[in-house]
Amino acid sequence: MTASRPKALQTFCLLLPLLVWMVDRSLCYKPVIVVHGLFDSSANFKNLLQYINESHPGTNVTVLDLFDNKESLQPLWKQVQGFKEAIYPIMQNAGRDGVHLLCYSQGGLICRGLLQTMPDHNVDTFISLSSPQMGQYGDTDYLRYLFPTYVKSNLYRLCYTQMGQTFSICNFWNDPHHHGIYVNVSDFLAPLNSERPEPNATDWKKNFLRLRKMVLIGGPDDGVITPWESSHFGFYDENETVLEMKYQMVYQDDTFGLRSMDYRGAITVYGVPGVVHTMWHSNQTVFKNCIEKWLT
């Protein structure tokens, strides 16, 4: 009886480092908060949840079930407020360790709204997955479904009105041929980018720069985000020639902290061909190559 005790103790001592390593691995993963896109819901992210659980077991992942499906057409500032109320307790529970934000499509703009308006957020890494960060200007199936009597060239007549700005898609509709109207009328993207005088611009920039890392993911075969380079903060000029992020006014003037983030090496950009818009969050190769390493 007494002879077996040293052996048991020896076995326990041998296993202890492995047990500690296993516990440490699950404890070191920051909580992940996922925000869905237009006409989406939490039900569409089962594959992503599986990928995270397989690669980082024990990670606390929350796919927020707010503004689902047609409710995702609600004005973006309203959605920002709703998501803020849901996210804040998760951030508080995470404490100093912080959280990661993984935001898809329209959700990427909602997350920017959160980041810029929350002075005490503790987001470590913001992953923007095929999100129109510089806006949208293109004839897509979504546009034809929502506004069947309009095309991209005349949608500004609806979007740049008080009624139009009650639709989320109009909040980031960025017509390069009517830029002046966009700047004056846009309720969301123009003030978020500080493209017009904004009384909160200094505070919003400071809040955004609390981020440690921003990851921008998009690709040429997306088929919805137009131009697709908007997912990388690129956009059309008045001739519909795409100018990359570094040639955008918001970067050159550092209106909300984009250039500052880039200068400190805090932005990583992935351009992935062969992925259509609705498959970004289900594509395992995208997860392995562009997302997994940032969720530690």
Curated annotation (Swiss-Prot):
Organism superkingdom: Eukaryota
Annotated glycan sites: N53, N60, N184, N200, N239, N283
Cell compartment(s), UniProt: Lysosome
Disulfide pattern: C103-C111, C159-C170
Pfam families: Palm_thioest (PF02089)
Gene Ontology CC terms: extracellular region; lysosome
Catalytic residues (positions): S105 (nucleophile), D222, H277
EC number in record: 3.1.2.2
Coiled coil: none
Signal peptide: 1-28
Entries under InterPro entries matching the protein: AB_hydrolase_fold
Protein keywords: Disulfide bond, Glycoprotein, Hydrolase, Lysosome, Signal
Primary location recorded for the protein, binned into one broad class: other
Molecular-function GO terms, alphabetical: fatty acyl-CoA hydrolase activity; palmitoyl hydrolase activity; palmitoyl-(protein) hydrolase activity; thiolester hydrolase activity
Enzyme class: hydrolase
Enzymatic reactions: hexadecanoyl-CoA + H2O = hexadecanoate + CoA + H(+); S-hexadecanoyl-N-acetylcysteamine + H2O = N-acetylcysteamine + hexadecanoate + H(+)
Function: Catalyzes the cleavage of thioester bonds from S-palmitoyl-CoA or S-palmitoyl-N-acetylcysteamine (unbranched structures) but does not have activity against palmitoylcysteine or palmitoylated proteins, branched structures or bulky head groups. Conversely, hydrolyzes both long and short chain fatty acyl-CoA substrate.
Family that this chain belongs to: Belongs to the palmitoyl-protein thioesterase family.
Name under which the protein is recorded: Lysosomal thioesterase PPT2-A
Lineage: Eukaryota, Metazoa, Chordata, Craniata, Vertebrata
Gene from which the chain derives: ppt2-a
